[in-house]
Regions:
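Catalytic phosphate/metal-binding cores of nucleic-acid and nucleotide-processing enzymes, i.e., regions
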Residues: 1-123
């Protein structure tokens, strides 16, 4: 049986990835031993604690905001209805938000669509 969180993550990635101006990629993360040295090597963006999906949402800046488009870094941490974020994941979410990005815990495709389409107020 497939992992529920993995299935949810795939549905969310495909759903928000189909929206205009929104791109999301799976952030594979973890650690493995280097076969040459035996040292553990971490991989993934902001590992440990990096969100499951990372990407950007293109925001059109209104004329009073100079009139340019910018890509806003977006990190979605996928959790099932009962899943809990680790302290490292919470810190990463807080860091992205503090830096002006979009980051959230997402439990459904509806959550992801809301985050991907609601007016951006981060600037």
């Amino acid at each position: 049986m497939a992992n529920q969180e993995t299935d949810l993550q795939q549905r969310i990635r495909l759903t928000v990835g189909a929206l205009p101006g929104f791109r999301a990629w799976r952030n594979n993360s973890g650690k493995l031993p280097d076969p040459r040295t035996g040292r553990w090597v971490q991989f993934g963006v902001a590992s440990p604690g990096g969100s499951d999906l990372i990407g950007y949402r293109t925001i059109e800046i209104t004329p009073d905001m100079v009139g340019r488009k910018v890509a806003v870094f977006t990190a979605l941490e996928i959790k099932t209805a009962t899943g809990r974020a680790t302290p490292e994941q919470r810190r990463f979410i807080d860091h992205i938000r503090a830096a002006g990005g979009i980051s959230a815990i997402v439990r459904t495709t509806a959550d992801a669509l809301r985050i991907a389409t609601e007016p951006f107020r981060g600037i």
